[in-house]
């Protein structure tokens, strides 16, 4: 009986150790400095706020609101907004409205935005009021 117990214990240990080792060597995809209530954009080193700013804002106010959150916070680029739109179910709680982007359309002098019902990109005057979802980017260490 002792021999059987020893063999069984050895087999269970052999099965458990690789699993435990594999789990312990996996990297946490989150930056340890990432702010609370943020979600990492898959495949990018950018984190999305878990919620919209409390109201619709002009572009200037939206840009200031994100920057005032602290170092690393800003409006998302139009490319980042497109990626966020693709993963909107992962991030959750998006309105069916336009969201401001960081960049300006140099031809029109208006700022880009993206509609979260259909992914349509448009541009509008800075005084228009749209939804805002800030992003955080970790500081680069070169």
PLM region spans:
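Short linear Ser/Thr-Pro motifs
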Residues: 17, 49, 101-102
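An exposed tryptophan-centered "aromatic clamp" motif
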Residues: 59-72, 78-128, 135-138
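Bacterial N-terminal signal peptides that target proteins for export
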Residues: 1-8
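Local alpha-helix boundary/kink/capping signal
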Residues: 16-19, 82
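Short, solvent-exposed mixed-charge patches
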Residues: 141-142
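Extracellular adhesion/carbohydrate-recognition regions
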Residues: 21-73, 109-113
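Bacterial N-terminal signal peptides
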Residues: 8-16
């Amino acid at each position: 009986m002792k021999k059987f117990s020893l063999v069984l214990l050895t087999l269970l240990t052999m099965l458990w150790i690789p699993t435990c080792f594999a789990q312990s060597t996996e990297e946490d995809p989150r930056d340890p400095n990432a702010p609370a209530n943020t979600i990492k954009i898959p495949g990018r080193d950018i984190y999305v706020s878990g919620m919209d700013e409390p109201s619709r804002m002009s572009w200037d106010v939206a840009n200031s609101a994100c920057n005032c959150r602290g170092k690393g916070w800003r409006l998302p680029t139009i490319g980042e907004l497109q990626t966020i739109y693709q993963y909107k179910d992962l991030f959750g709680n998006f309105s069916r409205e336009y969201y401001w982007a960081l960049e300006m359309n140099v031809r029109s002098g208006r700022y880009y935005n993206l509609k979260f019902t259909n992914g349509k990109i448009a541009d509008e005057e800075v005084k228009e009021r749209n939804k805002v979802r800030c992003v955080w980017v970790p500081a680069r260490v070169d």
